[in-house]
């Protein structure tokens, strides 16, 4: 959060990657937990909340709408005083940065509870779609208007009148739209059941599992019919569990586990393990397919390898964020790798399919860019390059891996432009990466 990086970082080639990394808290769990704790009856202590731009945005927004919270000393433990479903402040201007995990659930909660709210963010946020969520909410009587381009933030929310207990939302753009409706549903289900129907295929299902798991911890059960229909029975409300612990971020784990797979390892991450509620732990299955050895404990995962990585051809619909790590690991494979069903990359922090294609080509890779797939053929030699990061934390973290020496080809000197963007989810990333690669960065 308050770590300041220079305008660029030069990373030197690294022969080895080994060590132990304590992961920061999960972004997905942190922002969901903050909103649920705010909506709950009672006071919640949140342990190991992620310190990042995205969680800061959520904390500031909650404060502006009257939710009281305190940080415990210098720790990442917070106390949130729940408002039992009724935000005390009914008029606010809320800056949401580029945090999809904040703006989408908050939009639904504020539209359902009612008031006069404006939500806006950085310019990229105003290019990230929110129309499916707004359509679903307005169809049942909320009052949300676009103040810029239709279908995108900024948004102006006014008090509406909810008149229906069944709603529909498309599932193929972002699972965060369904997450937002699910989290707001108990606020509408005071006297009648609420049902949410998903139109079309639902992407990123593991993120919905995180949502349902956390709602359960706050006392709300959701009945689901496959992945097409979700029902919240009447009369349920959020009740504080007292204390809730935030797991380490499984998406952040992917870079270090990939480093262990590429450069031998062993690299161990702590804070997430075999019982994780995050779907991104399944990233390790891809590393295993590529030839890495993975071991898992209750609260740790370790990766190592003893040679060349195999090329992979796989569907990554279920783990789109962690799949970016595979795109760079593919530089070290023995042939052409194909990442399929990654269309959601195009509406993330940047158009990640386009950005990944441009930057991998700088390193010498041959890349075929499809609408929802990437086909990556590694270069004979990884070329030194200055990598642009597109204000996208995952681009910066992924491409650090191109410095590693693998069994088939060696890493190169890599310049990361605008390394500060990692503050979105992992402010200390480059310090942690330098530790496992024994690079004297700072």
UniProtKB/Swiss-Prot annotation:
Q: What does the record give as the active site?
A: 321
Q: Write out the GO cellular component annotations.
A: cytoplasm
Catalytic activity reads: 3-phosphoshikimate + phosphoenolpyruvate = 5-O-(1-carboxyvinyl)-3-phosphoshikimate + phosphate
Q: What are the binding positions for 3-phosphoshikimate in this chain?
A: 27-28, 32, 174-176, 204, 321, 348
**Which GO MF terms are attached to this record?**
3-phosphoshikimate 1-carboxyvinyltransferase activity
**PROSITE patterns per the UniProt record, alphabetical:** EPSP_SYNTHASE_1, EPSP_SYNTHASE_2
Lineage, top-rank taxon, reads: Bacteria
SUPFAM superfamilies from the UniProt entry: EPT/RTPC-like
Where along this sequence does the record place binding of phosphoenolpyruvate? 27, 100, 128, 176, 352, 394, 424
Please give the biological process terms from Gene Ontology that the record holds.
Answer: amino acid biosynthetic process; aromatic amino acid family biosynthetic process; chorismate biosynthetic process
Keyword entries, A-Z: Amino-acid biosynthesis, Aromatic amino acid biosynthesis, Cytoplasm, Transferase
Spell out the subcellular localization from the entry: Cytoplasm
- Keyword Disulfide bond among record annotations: no
Query: What pathway is this protein a component of?
Result: Metabolic intermediate biosynthesis; chorismate biosynthesis; chorismate from D-erythrose 4-phosphate and phosphoenolpyruvate: step 6/7
| Documented EC number(s) | 2.5.1.19
Q: How does it assemble?
A: Monomer.
Similarity annotation: Belongs to the EPSP synthase family.
Cited function: Catalyzes the transfer of the enolpyruvyl moiety of phosphoenolpyruvate (PEP) to the 5-hydroxyl of shikimate-3-phosphate (S3P) to produce enolpyruvyl shikimate-3-phosphate and inorganic phosphate.
Q: Which NCBIfam families match?
A: aroA
Protein's recorded name: 3-phosphoshikimate 1-carboxyvinyltransferase
Corresponding gene? aroA
